[in-house]
Amino acid sequence: MAEMTYQVAVIGGGPAGYVAAIRAAQLGGKVVLFEKDELGGTCLNRGCIPTKTFLKTADMIRDIHKAVQHGVINDPATSVDMEKVVANKDHVVRQLTGGVGALLRSNGVTVVKGEAALSGEHEIACGGKTYTADSIILCGGSVATRIPIPGIDDPNVLTSTEILDLKELPDKLVIIGGGVIGCELACAFAPFGSHVTIVEATDRLIPLMDRELADSLKESLIKSGIDVRTSVKITEIRSENGKTFLHCADGSKLEADKILLSVGRGTDLSCLGTLKDTIRTEKGKVVVDDGMRTSVPHIYAAGDINGRLMLAHTAFKMGETAAENAMGGHKTVDLSFVPSCVYAIPQVASVGMTEDEAVAKYGRDALRIGKFPFAANGRALSCGEPEGYVKVIMLEKYSEFCGVHIFGAQAAEMIAEPTALMCAEMTVEETADMIHAHPSFSEAFMEACGDAMGRCIHLPKKR
């Protein structure tokens, strides 16, 4: 069965998997990729991309309201046709998943549709057939986490998968979880016309990001009409008289037409198959080294399945690294400077340490904090986007970047520059000396660096 034998087999066609398959093929490998659902994984089909189409629609509604201020229109009244919103989302998803399929075909990758799992150290079972490979890359991805409370299986409780297919707008939407997905979808459904409430068990939103960013985002969401409740735990979901209620530990009760459960994701280890006790795991995640090797040397694990950083852009690099090593290379993934973005309205983006982390490592006296508000940036003002700021955390002794945090309209695009500079080991002082285009949002980063150095031009003198 020579046609069933490959140099590299990849289980899972998400960001890590399809990149791994393409890279291995580029290096001359005979490659097979198994996908049980649709190419592109959670990111393209049920996560990153679909949510951004919803957010673009929400941004357009926001722009219509702002157009009154700019003298473009007189009547800002809007209504949302959810069927068309979903159809647009589906169109974008089809374009991208179709593009992934075309890329795989152009590189000669064999794609097998079906659920695959290891049946031996060099064997994969799929659809009643057995495939063999010299090296195997596991890219099983992750699944939405469910919290064990009474009523969690109520039909009105949705994950991000189901809510992105809603054809009718809920009047009252309660989001359990104030992380990335929860905040992003809150910023979509509120402009659509839903009354949105976010309930977060910890003391702040986006708990893994800089505390000041979290506080700024909370304040902004509340200002936009979103009800934000932190340090509140849901104890039960119950249907009463045809309505759905969430009961909270503090004794309060929330009514909802739909409930979005957004409390994180857990790894999907089903692809381990008969090797589930052979391949080393810890806390439900496959253990890998920096080259993505598992405890079985010719088997690799990339993306969410290893739990290192559950981000699509890290999955891309992990998949590429695993593929190069599967083809005989010696590559590692450096996760020192990975940007994180929340596509809320306004956006949030970070790279490096949070302020709390930097203080814990170096002490408050060793640091200088530079900040520059978009309200003092000409480009932001002319675009009607004055909200937010750039924050630079500097280790004073070496003028070294510890972290950069951005809250504002273009944060996700702007974070690439500080990420590149930190990877290149450029200093805050050197960045403050760089000429940035004027007028541009990116000037705010340069000015924040200048503020950290004590020489920001476009802020009043500190006394």
List each language-model region with its residue ranges.
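Beta1/beta-strand and adjacent pyrophosphate-binding region of the FAD-binding site
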Residues: A2-G14, L169-G179
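Glycine-rich flavin
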Residues: A2-Y6, I22-G29, F34-L169, T197, ...
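Flexible, glycine-rich terminal cap/loop adjacent to redox cofactors
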Residues: A9-G13, A25-D37, T42, I49, ...
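N-terminal Rossmann-fold NAD(P) dinucleotide-binding loop
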Residues: G17, G182-C183
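Gly/Ala-rich phosphate-binding loop of Rossmann-like dinucleotide-binding domains
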Residues: A21, A25, A186, A190-P191
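A structural signal for the hydrophobic beta-strands that form the central parallel beta-sheet
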Residues: V111, L138, T159, V228-T230, ...
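Glycine-/small-residue-rich beta->alpha transition segments that form the dinucleotide
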Residues: A133-S135, C139-T145, A256-L269, I305
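Short FAD-binding loop at a beta-strand-to-alpha-helix junction that anchors the flavin cofactor
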Residues: D290-L309, Y398
